[in-house]
Every structure is written in structure tokens, then in C-alpha cells.
Amino acid sequence: MSVSKDQILDAIAEMSVMDVVALIEAMEEKFGVTAAAGMVAGPAAEAVEEKTEFDVILTGAGANKVSAIKAVRSATGLGLKEAKALVEAAPTPVKEGISKEEAEALAKDLTEAGAEVEVK
């Protein structure tokens, strides 16, 4: 009787962490391999790319909700109703995929209006 890959994966999924570790050790011994990630065949590590697109997330309206709504409205061009809904739905993205400079400027404007902001 042949065991399918799905049956093997299901059996492993039901195992405890300690049982999985023991299984891996047994497989390493039986097949003469290691489960450690090797860097032998990989190219030299490249420098980490600097992030070029940022998201400005409104995490809270702060003490002055009206100022936060005005700041969101001026930054996004939304109508009053939409800007109010966005502020009340915090945490929510205000703008996504913008440059670092634009994200920092928007975060500064919103923070000055009393809103709580996060740049990701």
C-alpha cells in the first residue's frame, strides 16, 4: 500500500512539535542530510533594498477629531462624509504606495492636527 503526500502531510500536521523535531532528526540520520538552510549554492547576499513605497495609516483621531477629519480631507480630497468615515474607522490607511517624502509630510500634517499616525 502506497501512502500519498497528502496523507503524510496530514499525519505531520497532527503531530506535536516535539514529535516533528524527532521525525526531522530521524530523517536526517536515515538520509544523511541536514534540515538547516544552506547558503552553499546561493549567491552572495545582496544589500537590503530600501523601501520606496510607504503607507500612511491613521491609528486614531486623537483628542481633536474635527481637525483630524479636516487634515484627512485636505490630504486625500475626500468629501466630508467620506473623510469622517475614514477617521472613525481607524486604524485605516489614509494613502498607500506613496514616496517616503510624501508619507512623512502627510504624517506630519495629520500629527499636527492631533491624529495618531503610523508610516509603514
From Swiss-Prot:
Disulphide linkage map: none
GO molecular function: mRNA binding; structural constituent of ribosome
GO cellular component terms attached to this protein's record: cytosolic large ribosomal subunit
Domain of life: Bacteria
Key words of the record: Ribonucleoprotein, Ribosomal protein
Name listed for the protein in its UniProt record: Large ribosomal subunit protein bL12
Subunit structure: Homodimer. Part of the ribosomal stalk of the 50S ribosomal subunit. Forms a multimeric L10(L12)X complex, where L10 forms an elongated spine to which 2 to 4 L12 dimers bind in a sequential fashion. Binds GTP-bound translation factors.
GO biological process, one term: translation
Annotated function: Forms part of the ribosomal stalk which helps the ribosome interact with GTP-bound translation factors. Is thus essential for accurate translation.
UniProt similarity note: Belongs to the bacterial ribosomal protein bL12 family.
UniProt key word Ribosomal protein: yes
Taxonomic lineage: Bacteria, Pseudomonadati, Pseudomonadota, Gammaproteobacteria, Alteromonadales
